[in-house]
């Protein structure tokens, strides 16, 4: 579950498709939107950790679920596995603290974004990504105000993203239909 976070998942999980393995690969203008816990996770990765993550990311289609991927990670590096589980549990606790409507919204986003992962050897389909982002934004906008407010407390960075003018301009330009 640690592949989320634009609209609860979009940036993070999409980044999981092109895992940067280093905060230095993320443009400066986007770094302010990344939660400290995620920054710390990446900041504390060793070269060996990054190599392990790259190797496992290249095999993502072979894992039946997240637990299988974590088990493979554990077999490669118990220390890295512990870090990943800690981050996963942090995010999972935030999601689990939500009321049913907000939790359903987040779970739906996670499922949608995970479905965008390309098959082995394939590239991420940018048009599908754009459509998924448009769908997620439309679903967010359709939420009642109470649910939107509830999402703010456990996910302050997501709120910051959604309400940031600079990000909105970047997102609108990216999401334009070709």
From Swiss-Prot:
Glycans are attached at residues 44, 75, 157. Disulfide bonds: none annotated. This is Fatty-acid and retinol-binding protein 1. Belongs to the fatty-acid and retinol-binding protein (FARBP) family. It is found in: Secreted. N-glycosylated. Pfam families: Gp-FAR-1. Gene3D superfamilies: 1.20.120.1100. Residues 1-16 form the signal peptide. GO terms for molecular function: fatty acid binding; retinal binding; retinol binding. The keyword Electron transport does not apply. The gene is far-1.
């Amino acid at each position: 579950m640690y592949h989320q976070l634009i609209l609860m998942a979009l940036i993070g999980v999409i980044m999981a498709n092109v895992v940067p393995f280093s905060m230095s690969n993320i443009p400066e203008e986007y770094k302010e939107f990344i939660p400290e816990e995620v920054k710390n996770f990446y900041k504390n990765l060793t070269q060996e950790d990054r190599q392990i993550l790259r190797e496992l990311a290249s095999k993502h289609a072979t894992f039946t679920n997240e637990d299988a991927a974590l088990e493979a990670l554990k077999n490669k590096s118990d220390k890295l596995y512990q870090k990943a589980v800690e981050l996963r549990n942090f995010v999972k606790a935030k999601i689990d603290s939500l009321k049913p409507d907000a939790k359903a919204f987040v779970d739906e986003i996670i499922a949608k974004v995970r479905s965008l992962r390309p098959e082995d050897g394939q590239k991420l389909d940018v048009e599908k990504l754009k459509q998924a982002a448009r769908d997620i934004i439309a679903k967010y906008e359709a939420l009642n105000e109470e649910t939107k407010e509830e999402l703010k407390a456990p996910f302050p960075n997501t709120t910051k993203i959604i309400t940031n003018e600079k990000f909105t301009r970047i997102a609108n330009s990216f999401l334009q239909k070709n």
